[in-house]
Curated annotation (Swiss-Prot):
Record-listed E.C. numbers: 1.2.1.38
Catalysed reactions listed for this entry: N-acetyl-L-glutamate 5-semialdehyde + phosphate + NADP(+) = N-acetyl-L-glutamyl 5-phosphate + NADPH + H(+)
Protein name: N-acetyl-gamma-glutamyl-phosphate reductase 2
Gene3D superfamilies to which the protein is assigned, alphabetical: Dihydrodipicolinate Reductase, domain 2, NAD(P)-binding Rossmann-like Domain
Gene: argC2
Enzyme class per UniProt: oxidoreductase
Keyword annotations: Amino-acid biosynthesis, Arginine biosynthesis, Cytoplasm, NADP, Oxidoreductase
Active-site residue list: 117
Primary role: Catalyzes the NADPH-dependent reduction of N-acetyl-5-glutamyl phosphate to yield N-acetyl-L-glutamate 5-semialdehyde.
């Protein structure tokens, strides 16, 4: 039986390198690569794109659109890791745990968009509550999130790594900073479309002086609701939604052992995995709750999710290579 052929268009980038590393040791697939000198050769790329079973695009948005235009074979499946097609018609959103039946859609699709890192954490927390009517679709959602600097790609990685090398481990000039202050972050449309919310969430991302890891926080002022759910009810609803899932883990409610020194929620604890952990914190007296997702922005937030989606698209056990 022939092994399925996989081509990573953009394998030299941050996500591409991570996916290549995860796939290179596997003996159940055949990786097809392009010579470094021909990475910008449209004819050579088109030849490779149309010769494989699955093409994984790890490219900027415009380059991803160009790559899709080069594919003329209906037998080639495309998994795009850019933001170009995450809200596009004709594309299946590659978050298998998001909805019942999502895996089947991914398995049967020719075109699959790999989710963004921030949206993965956000949707893991909020989608179950909207889908089950625990929160109304009109609920105003705010997201505060922090990612390691690898989320900024090669340029930001080089900036931080260079500073660390020069200063022999000292923190950088920008140990923590928020951005996206024009409220136009490219992930907002994706979050809105796939969450079931009536209005876009207010999203404020940040970058910290650590390489990878991510915390996505959603505060819930439950006192604004006429009959607010308790923190435990919210936790139960999310836990039930993800029952039996391998890569979405709902942490026990009010378990101090999950916190560093009983106080801190560490952004880096699941690095190197394809796991997103969901936490629920609540105070029923003040009618407040906090949802937190913890994930590796390069794992379940990028390359790990891509490998999981690839496995589903090929009809393989989705944990292979993860």
């Amino acid at each position: 039986m022939n092994k399925p052929k996989i081509f990573i268009d953009g394998e030299a980038g941050t996500t591409g390198l991570q996916i290549y590393s995860r796939l290179n040791e596997r003996d159940d697939i055949e990786l097809v690569s392009i010579a470094a000198s021909k990475r910008k050769d449209a004819d050579e790329r088109a030849k490779l794109l149309n010769s494989v079973d699955v093409a994984i695009l790890c490219l900027p948005d415009d380059a991803a659109r160009e790559a899709v235009s080069l594919v003329n074979s209906s037998q080639v499946k495309i998994l795009d890791a850019s933001t170009a097609y995450r809200t596009a018609q004709g594309w299946v959103y590659g978050f298998p745990e998001m909805n019942p039946g999502q895996r089947e859609k991914i398995a049967n699709a020719q075109f699959v968009s790999n989710p963004g890192c921030y949206p993965t954490g956000f949707l893991a927390c909020v989608r179950p509550l909207i889908a089950q009517g625990i929160l109304p679709s009109s609920f105003p959602i705010t997201i505060n999130a922090v990612s390691g600097y690898s989320g900024g790609g090669k340029s930001l990685i080089q900036k931080y790594d260079s500073f660390h090398e020069q200063q022999k481990g000292a923190t950088s000039d920008y140990p923590f900073g928020i951005y996206g202050l024009q409220f136009g972050h490219k992930h907002v449309k994706e979050m809105h479309q796939h969450s079931g919310l009536a209005s876009p969430p207010l999203f404020i991302p940040a970058v910290g002086d650590f390489e990878q890891g991510m915390l996505v926080q959603i505060p819930l002022p439950l006192w604004t609701l006429d009959n607010p759910p308790s923190g435990e009810e919210i936790h139960q609803a999310i836990a039930q939604y993800y029952q039996g899932e391998k890569f979405v883990q709902v942490a026990p409610f009010k378990d101090p052992s999950l916190l560093r020194d009983g106080t801190f929620l560490d952004a880096t604890a699941v690095n190197g995995t394809n796991i997103v952990q969901v936490f629920v914190f609540g105070n029923d007296n003040t009618k407040e709750a906090l949802l937190v997702a913890r994930l590796d922005n390069l794992g379940k937030g990028a390359s790990g999710a891509a490998v999981q989606n690839l496995n589903i698209m090929l009809g393989l056990p989705e944990e292979l290579g993860l």
